[in-house]
Amino acid sequence: MAATRSPTRARERERSGAPAAGSDQVHSWMLATSQALDTVWRMAKGFVMLAVSFLVAAICYFRRLHLYSGHKLKWWIGYLQRKFKRNLSVEAEVDLLSYCAREWKGETPRNKLMRKAYEELFWRHHIKCVRQVRRDNYDALRSVLFQIFSQGISFPSWMKEKDIVKLPEKLLFSQGCNWIQQYSFGPEKYTGSNVFGKLRKYVELLKTQWTEFNGIRDYHKRGSMCNTLFSDAILEYKLYEALKFIMLYQVTEVYEQMKTKKVIPSLFRLLFSRETSSDPLSFMMNHLNSVGDTCGLEQIDMFILGYSLEVKIKVFRLFKFNSRDFEVCYPEEPLRDWPEISLLTENDRHYHIPVF
């Protein structure tokens, strides 16, 4: 009996143990699978993070490389432009109203006034284009000399009668103007024993250039030569200093005439009535020496320039629009046969060249 029950119990224990063993196997398999998936996930996550980090680093690197390359490219472009492109001090013609629209945007009273002034030039005075002139303390002299050369205007009558190369020595030796050695060459601020020699060379250069331009009849060829000349800053500077000396010579000549009680133009009476320009020396020290350095030409200097070169300088003063001073001439009473050149200014300090 006991033997009969014993195998039965054994079979019952086997039947009850079989599910337990199967459950353990399933649990072990699931645990192993979970661990494997976790390991794979961690590896995948690490790989993704590594890839993202690499991608971010690559983006940052290429961004810096792009910025650096762009900076170097701009530098080289600027260098090549400076190296091979003419740095014109008188730019090419641009449409007048387009220039006005670009420079005088906005609705301030001054902007509105300037736009009306430019429209007046366009419609009433038939000025269609403008040449921008480099803004510095020589720009009035530059604007005048450019037009004299580009138009092929001849020497003033008094220059045809005298050798202007000898004017410095005439002042120094014939008229005893020893103070000429205090002449200052604009920003160079050079004074000393070599002033006489420098002035002579500069005046001779002016005579040579003027003669060459005056001898060319082809307008386009003169324009091409002007582009070459007015891209040479050193050469320009010498010509402007020569013009300043021509002005000083004329002031000295008229002053000598005044001392002998001769009739002189009214503009010179005004010049000599000022404490700061009562004679040629004070005019040079207080006014002319600063031109090209700390200031440009004043209105009375424009009168002297026009008188010295025997040209009628018509200036449209745009900031004086709707007043009697909108259009002025230097000098006010030029001779009929004097050639005319035109300038425009927005502030009486800087000048541009109108093109009709």
Swiss-Prot record:
Cellular localisation: Cytoplasm; Endoplasmic reticulum membrane; Nucleus envelope
UniProt region (Disordered), positions on chain: 1-22
Membrane topology: Peripheral membrane protein
GO cellular component, one term: cytoplasmic side of endoplasmic reticulum membrane
InterPro entries documented for this protein: FAM105, OTULINL
Residues covered by the OTU domain: 128-356
Entry-linked Pfam families: Peptidase_C101
Keyword Transmembrane helix: no
CDD domains in the cross-refs: OTU_OTULL (cd22798)
Region Required for membrane binding, annotated ranges: 1-83
Signal sequence annotation: none
UniProt keyword terms in alphabetical order: Cytoplasm, Endoplasmic reticulum, Membrane, Nucleus
Domain comment, as recorded: The N-terminal region that precedes the OTU domain mediates interaction with cellular membranes.
Protein family membership: Belongs to the peptidase C65 family. Otulin subfamily.
Assembly notes: Does not bind ubiquitin or ubiquitin-like proteins.
Role of this protein: Lacks deubiquitinase activity.
Protein name: Inactive ubiquitin thioesterase OTULINL
